[in-house]
């Protein structure tokens, strides 16, 4: 993120070319922080509201050391609330009003209880019983098809076959029919618009389709090219995602039905373990989700550049990299031209079938009618309690 913000020397420091952190384009004097950029970055204002760019109190960070941020007690706060009773893993804790917050006089709520409820049905029942005021009914991730250590996944025709054998409408209906929609491109709908008002998601959509006959033909040809008569793949997904099991079951069923010779196994691990497996390329196919950090295309297209830390499948394309770089540099101040660059990048992903967009996650929630001022965002911080309150 520091590199994509055009922060001076961030890329060279991350790569190790520069060791002196004082050369990073950030200086602090008193209560003023100054950032020096190498080129225009329209989305930089969004970065400044993101936690990665929040200044930390050096003396406290050094005092706490490796325990910094691991529990509510090992953290200091500058926002509207303090976190209480969080031990690093428990699913229920409190947000307590911070009297030192700069706008505390307008924060009406003294405390907020946050509780993790894994089962949607349980959340609904608790809502009906008055135990909670707001419930998100579903949450899941999008399937992400990548090259791994399996030889067959280095074959373009096999990857294309998997994409063509993915019934996106069926997955949504079977697993996440709570406001989610079938994916058409990498960026979700309503993330950003072109100057003419067209949705970026629709504009960049390269034409993903569900075509089992074409998928079967390509799969057969691909197997012949790699010298195999059959293929076994494992799909890795989050064990703590309420919809992941249904999604994986549906994909397994449709893939095996459409592609004779394919056997799909399921592997469910914790969210933390899934991240580790993805980072270490310990997967064949992994369900992977991403929420945008800000309302602009680079928050998604930055994922698949050759050197991106989130490019778990090690996809590499000069065409993709060049298009992305052009969008965030030369065309950064020209939204229409940047959209064309993103469309070029999307086509590179589509042509090589290095990933498989399945659905855009949408959430429906139950909210107490007495709860006012609660803000929900589509990017960045999902829920903002700053000015939320309950009426009598």
Regions found by a protein language model. Give the residues of each.
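Gly/Pro-rich hinge or "lid" segments in bacterial periplasmic/extracellular proteins
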Residues: 8-12, 19-21, 30, 37, ...
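Extracytoplasmic/peripheral linker and loop segments enriched in polar/acidic and small residues
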Residues: 18-28, 160, 261-274, 301-368, ...
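Alpha-helical secondary-structure segments
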Residues: 30-34, 80, 109-111, 129, ...
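Alpha-to-beta junction loops
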Residues: 31-33, 123, 128-137, 254, ...
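Extracellular/periplasmic solute-recognition and catalytic clefts
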Residues: 84-94, 111-149, 173-174, 182
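Ligand/substrate-recognition segments at binding pockets and active sites
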Residues: 88, 212, 218-292, 363
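Structural transition elements
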Residues: 181-221, 242-245
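Long beta-strand-rich cores associated with HINT superfamily self-processing modules
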Residues: 365-392
């Amino acid at each position: 993120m520091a590199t994509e913000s055009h922060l001076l020397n961030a890329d060279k420091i991350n790569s190790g070319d520069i060791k002196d952190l004082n050369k990073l384009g950030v200086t602090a004097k008193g209560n003023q922080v100054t950032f020096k950029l190498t080129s225009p970055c329209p989305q930089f204002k969004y970065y400044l509201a993101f936690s990665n760019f929040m200044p930390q109190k050096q003396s406290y960070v050094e005092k706490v050391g490796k325990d910094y941020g691991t529990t509510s007690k090992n953290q200091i706060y500058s926002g509207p609330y303090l976190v209480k009773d969080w031990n690093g893993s428990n699913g229920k804790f409190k947000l307590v009003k911070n009297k030192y917050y700069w706008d505390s006089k307008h924060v009406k709520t003294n405390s907020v209880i946050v509780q993790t409820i894994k089962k949607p049905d349980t959340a609904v029942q608790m809502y009906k019983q008055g135990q909670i005021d707001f419930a998100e009914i579903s949450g899941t991730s999008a399937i992400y098809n990548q090259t791994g250590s399996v030889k067959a996944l280095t074959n373009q025709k096999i990857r294309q076959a998997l994409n063509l054998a993915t019934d996106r409408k069926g997955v949504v209906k079977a697993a996440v029919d709570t406001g989610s929609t079938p994916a058409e491109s990498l960026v979700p709908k309503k993330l950003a618009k072109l100057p003419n008002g067209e949705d970026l998601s629709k504009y960049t959509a390269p034409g993903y389709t569900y075509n089992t006959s074409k998928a079967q033909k390509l799969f057969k040809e691909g197997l012949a090219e790699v010298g195999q008569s059959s293929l076994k793949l494992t799909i890795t997904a989050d064990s703590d995602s309420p919809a992941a099991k249904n999604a994986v079951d549906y994909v397994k069923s449709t893939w095996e039905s459409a592609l004779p010779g394919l056997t799909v196994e399921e592997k469910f691990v914790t969210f933390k373990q899934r991240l580790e497996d993805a980072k270490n390329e310990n997967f064949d196919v992994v369900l992977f989700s991403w929420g945008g950090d800000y309302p602009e295309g680079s928050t998604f297209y930055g994922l698949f550049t050759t050197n991106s830390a989130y490019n778990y499948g090690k996809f590499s394309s000069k065409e993709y990299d060049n298009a992305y770089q052009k969008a965030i540099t030369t065309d950064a101040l020209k939204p229409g031209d940047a959209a064309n660059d993103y469309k070029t990048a999307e086509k590179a992903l589509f042509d090589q079938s290095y990933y498989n967009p399945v659905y855009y996650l949408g959430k429906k929630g139950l909210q107490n009618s007495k709860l006012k001022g609660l803000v929900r965002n589509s990017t960045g911080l999902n829920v903002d309690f700053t000015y939320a309150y309950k009426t009598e």
